[in-house]
UniProtKB/Swiss-Prot annotation:
Alphabetic keyword roster: ATP synthesis, Cell inner membrane, Cell membrane, CF(0), Hydrogen ion transport, Ion transport, Membrane, Transmembrane, Transmembrane helix, Transport
Organism field: Janthinobacterium sp. (strain Marseille)
Gene name per UniProt: atpF
Name under which the protein is recorded: ATP synthase subunit b
Record GO cellular component, one term: proton-transporting ATP synthase complex
Coiled-coil residues: none
Length: 156
């Protein structure tokens, strides 16, 4: 066989194989490679979105944490203020109660002083009558001289 004919036959077979490969084998391979490249690109994009979402979530979590701490501090402050107001109210109530008890005790003491004075006046009047009776050596009628005794009580 002739070398030229062999070479031409091999060229023809090569071109047929190349044409067959380009028509039937090459498109599915290119589609598979394109799909794989697209999946890789989508995966990288999803990873980037995940990173940005994570950063946003961390910022939001930090903001929520700061907000919660601020709210906690505000509640503690409000509780302390309320505690102080309750203490002040209790002190005020106790002072009012002490003043009321003191006023009642003072009124009771004044009433007892008045009763003791009246009793003392009666005793002084009785002693004065007895003293006058002994001085005069005669009996003095207390009912007759009631006005005089009342006048003496008033002077005492």
């Amino acid at each position: 066989m002739n070398l030229n004919a062999t070479l031409i036959a091999q060229f023809v077979v090569f071109f047929i194989l190349a044409g067959f490969t380009m028509k039937f084998v090459w498109p599915p391979l290119m589609n598979a490679l394109d799909e794989r490249a697209k999946k890789i690109a989508d995966g990288l994009a999803a990873a980037e979105r995940g990173k940005s979402d994570l950063a946003v979530a961390e910022k939001r979590a930090q903001a929520e944490l700061a907000s919660a701490q601020e709210a906690g501090q505000k509640r503690i402050s409000d509780a302390e203020k309320r505690g102080q107001s309750i203490i002040e109210e209790a002190k005020k109530t106790a002072a009012e109660e002490a003043a009321r008890i003191l006023a009642a005790a003072k009124a009771d003491a004044d009433q007892q002083v008045t009763q003791v004075r009246e009793a003392l006046r009666d005793q002084v009047a009785t002693l004065a009558v007895k003293g006058a009776e002994q001085i005069l050596k005669r009996e003095v009628n207390a009912t007759v001289h009631a006005d005089l005794l009342n006048q003496l009580k008033a002077e005492l």
